[in-house]
Amino acid sequence: MALWGKAHASATNKPKYLPTDENSDYNRGDSYATNDGWVMKAGTPASGNGNADADPEILVAIGGLAGVSSTTGLKAPTVTKMRFVVGNTATTDMTAGDGTQRILVEITYDEEVTVNTTGGTPTLVIANNDASGGGYGNHTLSYQPTGSTKNQIRFEKTSAGLGNTDVLTLGGSNIVLNSGTIKDTADGSTDASLVLSGLSAVAITVSS
């Protein structure tokens, strides 16, 4: 098995020796493709400094990897990972039972992306199976620039009605642009993929 890849639209191209643990300094999610190759995001623990504007560390040198158009390199940014971001407070840790919680998710791409909300704000629907019987229904999250960095973008609903034992699922619905845009930063014009259904769905259960 190759240690990394460069196939268009593959979710498994990133260097495989990088751990998937979010707490690791070399978390795979912080790796993405540029036209220099596979790099590690600047400003992360792996970079050795907190300067997010510094040049990223090149892990695997591959000229033209990201591409300069929709027909070169990786062609278009592809989603490689998605997750719920769980906090440690009463309204962010999914343990409020029957009450309101913040729902925050992070979508990771294999390339740097640029989100433009001038025409509208991208959204993402989180399914709720309503196991509690409270009738809270699905939740629509909106793009949140705070916490979004380079190849990772976040969607949030700050006050969502949830019931104890409700199961929330990420991945059943794709990103909706609502006249906003999510573009490949490498060329400035290629649309990033909005498809989440190619990955395994991620679920979280509300508790008390």
What are these regions (language model features)?
Residues 1-208:
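Non-catalytic beta-sheet/beta-sandwich ligand-binding modules that flank or precede catalytic cores
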